[in-house]
């Protein structure tokens, strides 16, 4: 049995094969001594270093890596057998340009040969010479050839001598801006600056006019100096809309030169290649022959050896121009390898060992094109921000693989840190197929499989390129990206799982994201969802509405023999008891049960009112999505919303077109019945809302807000005659249904009988709907009295969500009417199950439950007339401020405030105005008499002042005088309907503004949310962009996050469920962050979460606030290399302010406005993160 010695760190056994299988020298060629290479150092980093290491390992060659201090954690140093630090104390790029250190490492570690990779020193003749002088082989051309080809001006002269056509340009590097001016005068614009000692797009700048000349010259020089250690430039005529075709060549030390056909590198931005294709599609065979023969001719002219690339521009007429020779391996060498089956790195190494191309079996006649290959460079750049590099920690990395896919990468793994110091390349994806469309399909599929989280990438942009018809046809040129702006219509990645982990981590570190009024944890048990039968739910009143329209629906309601119920559990009940905090997640769970078991309901109140803004403000949910999802789950029961007349679902007046559009879109999303009211019963506001709802095709239910007591002869302001007169106006305006909206629960049975019977007698064919609250405890009796007096519909809530400030009990009404002519036909057993679910669900909202401070309703509501939801809120506020014992004083002040304002109808927003004034009086220790007497000197709440100005309408009986005049003094007064004087809102302009801020995925619903609540909507969008679809989390997780070791599932959508386990939270790091560890679908995930409390005690550079005009933030992470202005300087729009450098690319930050620099927050050489504040302009 053969025994082999242990191999340490490399596959040296393969060396046996290498030495024993070397072919014999050709008898016709003078042989050089064959010197096997045993140890290779790659003087580079990243994926190209790994590419060479892999080739060496396959050949049994030991590998050596070098790395800078900034690259300590990079993968390339781990892929080598040995790795050594270079450039200690040097800048990141300079470390890889420090020839003495690199040579020292090579000599000290017995390196036979150095592979330069690409970039850095790969085209530096002095480096090739230094290797040669040190007795280390340079895997590339000779130093002299590197010098000639690296000097693009000399290369150009050689091309001319070889008879290869060239673009008009300077004969030598220019040394001044004056020379650039002279060239422009001779050849005209456009021209292009190019770095004389490197490529890759650095140091390249196209200039279209004299005005651009100086800035672009300066930037090109600076970039070339930073990237290649030499800022020399040459200038040439810029050929517009050419194809960029390059030919791969390979030579040996015996004068043999061959080509491996061409690559099309036309898809570029900033002269840097993005997608490369081999072979070039639809290339004329004669042009291909000219390109390849000229490339070989040029290589022979200089005695080229090893791998290289000859680059050409091909104009629209098929004429080609030599650009340059890259005397190194190219980034895109991979596509050539795929179509020719030639390993170029193997060939490079063998040539450096002294082997000839024929020895390697490489003869021109044997090189054939096999199919097509495409390479996409996946980078950490943001196409939406002009491809600005992004930096940070990769939280998730999952690549696309499979048949026909090759990946060349380096530090593309979870936990890798992308720094601003080097190139933004993350991974090269190479697809190979039988033809161009097949390769494009494979590439598109592979990119779709990628998941990169934590840093932005250009994947969405690449996918757009691959789906572009011009690209698929193969007819692209270097203007392809510029001429196809639709490539930048990027479909954002959903990234839902990672965003949810960020949210859960944030809550685990910082606590709840929504204000918690009471320290009470959610119930540990989930509510029990009753079983639901399979199949569609039974027909309900919505089927009649869809079939017969609003008029037919109203007739069916009026002709129904028994009492109909509207369930408020999905809106007003939880607004009254749970601070409007019930989430869509819990509504959706019980929704199918409601659809199947409560089809006899008149409607469900589930939208509008306070739920609209609270959904966005505190629950981070889209109210429109709630409507859409509930509509899908409950197709048979009409939905009802609360529309505040001209206020829609807001607290102020909006232009008429906003209200009309809102109703239109609400109807399109599934809303059926619009209960239109006005907080002052101000008829013009109500008529506008009714018209908007009616024109949208909805059922119009005009609601008269009730206050006072029609059965009390002493209460004359809001008498029976007042309500009957108002009802006449609303019926005349065409309401389909008439509603009495008793917000405080003031309707007593006697008053119910008087009011409802009078309305029934006057409007025998009109459906009557009564809404109340049970604050006094008389709600069930009142609703029974209404039903007996002729009401068609009364409001109820699930038993466990009824009573107190909510609606009367559903079960009580069902039981009391059972077996009578008013029978609701609702099964009691279903009511019990429904109530049981809500009893469990209510426990999840313990922190918001009114019973934390309020143990019962109170009949004093007949005196203070506080609406149900507001009663709960005021009670909460009083207790939270330690004034629980003084709640009686708050209620007394409420009564006085109401009288000061003229005895208002109290419902949002008028109830809030009364409440604000009451709290103002309590906080300042004012009685009514004192407040009225000092009215001219006091600074009343804004809501009170605006009410007195007339901004929400005119109250019944007019404004209180002289109180109004004392408060307003010289302030303007609104005459008539407030919204009538408002100009129409430009909804299209608003949509564009939202798209500019939030991206293309802006919907008509978003536009209306922003129109109603601009600040709330903006925060909601920013929050969910960071933390994802939070309505998919259960309520316990949403409020308090998971416990360590807790396992749970999150259903993102049907068929997509995440299995998550919380593992650990780390200690605080120096950046004020904690690392939170999870297991997601069996894989470890970790995220960094800022500890907001700890960060208050730490100093960080301020961020630019997007909403503050004049605050200029860093568009990308990077280093400040130049500051163009000082504090006090006048700046024009577009004027350069400073220059940032990141990933060897410089970005000029320009002024977005004209103004004066107020303060500069950065200094030269300062390193910035994205959005760090640079300066302020005023």
Curated annotation (Swiss-Prot):
GO terms for cellular component: cytoplasm; cytosol; mitochondrial matrix; mitochondrion
Residues bearing the modification N6-biotinyllysine: 1144
Substrates-to-products reaction catalysed: hydrogencarbonate + pyruvate + ATP = oxaloacetate + ADP + phosphate + H(+)
EC number(s) recorded for this UniProt protein: 6.4.1.1
Residues carrying N6-carboxylysine: 741
Keyword Glycoprotein in annotation: no
SUPFAM superfamilies assigned to the protein according to its UniProt record, in alphabetical order: Aldolase, Glutathione synthetase ATP-binding domain-like, post-HMGL domain-like, PreATP-grasp domain, Rudiment single hybrid motif, Single hybrid motif
Domain ATP-grasp positions: 156-353
Pathway: Carbohydrate biosynthesis; gluconeogenesis
Binding site for ATP: 152, 236, 271
Residue span(s) of domain Biotin carboxylation: 36-486
Binding site for Mn(2+): 572, 741, 771, 773
Gene3D superfamilies per record: 2.40.50.100, Aldolase class I (3.20.20.70), ATP-grasp fold, B domain (3.30.470.20), pyruvate carboxylase f1077a mutant domain (3.10.600.10)
Residues modified as N6-acetyllysine: 35, 39, 79, 148, 152, 241, 297, 319, 434, 589, 661, 717, 748, 892, 969, 992, 1061, 1090, 1124
Summary of subunit composition and partner proteins: Homotetramer. Interacts (via the biotin carboxylation domain) with SIRT4.
Protein name: Pyruvate carboxylase, mitochondrial
């Amino acid at each position: 049995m053969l025994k082999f010695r242990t191999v340490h760190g490399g596959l040296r056994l393969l060396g046996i094969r290498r030495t024993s299988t070397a072919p014999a020298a050709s008898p016709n060629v003078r042989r050089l001594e064959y010197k096997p290479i045993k140890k290779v150092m790659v003087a580079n980093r990243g994926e190209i270093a790994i590419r060479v290491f892999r080739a060496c390992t396959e050949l049994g060659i030991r590998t050596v890596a070098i790395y800078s201090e900034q690259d300590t954690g990079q993968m390339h140093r781990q892929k080598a057998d040995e790795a050594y630090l270079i450039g200690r104390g040097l800048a990141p790029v300079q470390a890889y340009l420090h020839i003495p250190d690199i040579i020292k490492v090579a000599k000290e570690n017995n390196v036979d040969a150095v592979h330069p990779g690409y970039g850095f020193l790969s085209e530096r003749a002095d480096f090739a010479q230094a290797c040669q002088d040190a007795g280390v082989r340079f895997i590339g051309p000779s130093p002299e050839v590197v010098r000639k080809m690296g000097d693009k001006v000399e290369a150009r002269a050689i091309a001319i001598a070889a008879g290869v056509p060239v673009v008009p340009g300077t004969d030598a590097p220019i040394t001044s801006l004056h020379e650039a001016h002279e060239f422009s005068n001779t050849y005209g614009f456009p021209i292009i600056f190019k770095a004389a000692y490197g490529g890759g797009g650095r140091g390249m700048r196209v200039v279209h006019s004299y005005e651009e000349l100086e800035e672009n010259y300066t930037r090109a020089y600076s970039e070339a100096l930073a990237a290649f250690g030499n800022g020399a430039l040459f200038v040439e005529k810029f050929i517009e809309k050419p194809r960029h075709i390059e030919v791969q060549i390979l030579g040996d030390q015996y004068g043999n030169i061959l080509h491996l056909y061409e690559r099309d590198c036309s898809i570029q931005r900033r002269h840097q290649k993005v997608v490369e294709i081999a072979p070039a599609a639809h290339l004329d065979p004669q042009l291909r022959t000219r390109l390849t023969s000229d490339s070989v001719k040029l290589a022979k002219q200089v005695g080229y050896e090893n791998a290289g690339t000859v680059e050409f521009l091909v104009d629209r007429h098929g004429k080609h121009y030599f650009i340059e020779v890259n005397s190194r391996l190219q980034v895109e060498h991979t596509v050539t390898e795929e179509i020719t089956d030639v390993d170029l790195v193997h060939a490079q190494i063998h040539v450096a060992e002294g082997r000839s191309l024929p020895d390697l079996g490489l003869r021109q006649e044997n090189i054939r094109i096999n199919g097509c290959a495409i390479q996409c460079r996946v980078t950490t750049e943001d196409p939406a921000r002009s491809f600005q590099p992004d930096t940070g920690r990769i939280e998730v990395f999952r690549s696309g693989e499979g048949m026909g896919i090759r990946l060349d990468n380096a530090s593309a793994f979870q936990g890798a840190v992308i720094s601003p110091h080097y190139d933004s390349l993350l991974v090269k994806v190479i697809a190979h197929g039988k033809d161009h469309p097949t390769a494009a399909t494979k590439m598109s599929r592979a990119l779709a499989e990628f998941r990169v989280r934590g840093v932005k990438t250009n994947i969405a942009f690449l996918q757009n390129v691959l789906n572009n018809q011009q690209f698929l046809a193969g007819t692209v040129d270097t203007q392809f990206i510029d001429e196809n702006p639709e490539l930048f219509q990027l479909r954002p990645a959903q990234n839902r799982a990672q965003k949810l982990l960020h949210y859960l981590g944030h809550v685990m570190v910082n606590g709840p994201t929504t204000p918690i009024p009471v320290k009470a944890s959610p119930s540990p048990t989930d509510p029990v969802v009753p079983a639901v039968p399979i199949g569609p739910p039974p027909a309900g009143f919505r089927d009649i509405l869809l079939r017969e329209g609003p008029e037919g629906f109203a007739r069916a309601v009026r002709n129904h023999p028994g009492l109909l119920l509207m369930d408020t559990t999905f809106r007003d009940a939880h607004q009254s008891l749970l601070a409007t905090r019930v989430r869509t997640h819990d509504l959706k769970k019980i929704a199918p049960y409601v659809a199947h078991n409560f089809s006899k309901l008149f409607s469900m109140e589930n939208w509008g009112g306070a739920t609209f803004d609270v959904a966005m403000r505190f629950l981070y949910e889209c109210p429109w999505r709630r409507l859409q999802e509930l509509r899908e789950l409950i197709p048979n029961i009409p939905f009802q919303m609360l529309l505040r007349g001209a206020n829609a679902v807001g607290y102020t007046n909006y232009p008429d077109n906003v209200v009309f559009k809102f109703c239109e879109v609400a109807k399109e999303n599934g809303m059926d019945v619009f209960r239109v009211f006005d907080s002052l019963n101000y008829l013009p506001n109500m008529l506008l809302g009714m018209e908007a709802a009616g024109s949208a095709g909805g059922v119009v239910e005009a609601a008269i807000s009730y206050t006072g007591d029609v059965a009390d002869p002493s209460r004359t302001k809001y008498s029976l005659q007042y309500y009957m007169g108002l009802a006449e106006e609303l019926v005349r305006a065409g309401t389909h249904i008439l509603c009495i909206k008793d917000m405080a629960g003031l309707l007593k049975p006697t008053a119910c009988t008087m009011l409802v019977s009078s309305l029934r007698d006057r409007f025998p064919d009109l459906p009557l709907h009564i809404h109340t609250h049970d604050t006094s405890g008389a709600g069930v009796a009142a609703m029974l009295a209404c039903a007996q007096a002729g009401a068609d519909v009364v409001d109820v809530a699930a038993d466990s969500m009824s009573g107190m400030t909510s609606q009367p009990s559903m079960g009580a009404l069902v039981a009391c009417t059972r077996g009578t002519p008013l029978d609701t036909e609702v099964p009691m057993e279903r009511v019990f199950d429904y109530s049981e679910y809500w009893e469990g669900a209510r426990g999840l909202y313990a922190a918001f439950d009114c019973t934390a401070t309020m143990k019962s309703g109170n009949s004093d509501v007949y005196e203070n007339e506080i609406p149900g939801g507001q009663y709960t809120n005021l009670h909460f506020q009083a207790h939270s401020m330690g004034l629980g014992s003084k709640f009686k004083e708050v209620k007394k002040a409420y009564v006085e405030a109401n009288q000061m304002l003229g005895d208002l109808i109290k419902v949002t927003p008028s109830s809030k105005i009364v409440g604000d004034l009451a709290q103002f009086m309590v906080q300042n220790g004012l009685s009514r008499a004192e407040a009225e007497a000092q009215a001219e000197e006091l600074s009343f709440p804004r809501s009170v002042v605006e009410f007195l100005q007339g901004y929400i309408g005119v109250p019944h009986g007019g404004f209180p005088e002289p109180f109004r005049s004392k408060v307003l003094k010289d302030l303007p007064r609104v005459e008539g309907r407030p919204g009538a004087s408002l100009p129409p809102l430009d909804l299209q302009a608003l949509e564009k503004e939202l798209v500019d801020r939030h991206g293309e995925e802006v919907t008509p619903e978003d536009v209306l949310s922003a129109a109603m609540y601009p600040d709330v909507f903006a925060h909601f969008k920013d929050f969910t962009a960071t933390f994802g679809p939070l309505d998919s989390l259960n309520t316990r997780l949403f409020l308090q996050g998971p416990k360590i070791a807790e396992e749970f599932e999150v259903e993102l959508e049907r068929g997509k469920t995440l299995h998550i386990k919380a593992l650990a939270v780390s200690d605080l790091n120096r950046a004020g962050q904690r690392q939170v560890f999870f297991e997601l679908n069996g894989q470890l995930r970790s995220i960094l979460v800022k500890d907001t409390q700890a960060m208050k005690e730490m100093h960080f550079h301020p961020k630019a606030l997007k909403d503050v005009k004049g605050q200029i933030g860093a568009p990308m992470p990077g280093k400040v290399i130049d500051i163009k202005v000082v504090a006090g300087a006048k700046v024009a729009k577009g004027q350069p302010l400073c220059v940032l450098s990141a990933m060897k690319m410089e970005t000029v930050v320009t002024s977005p406005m004209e103004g004066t620099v107020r303060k500069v927050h950065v200094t030269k050489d300062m390193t910035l993160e994205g959005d760090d504040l640079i300066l302020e302009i005023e």
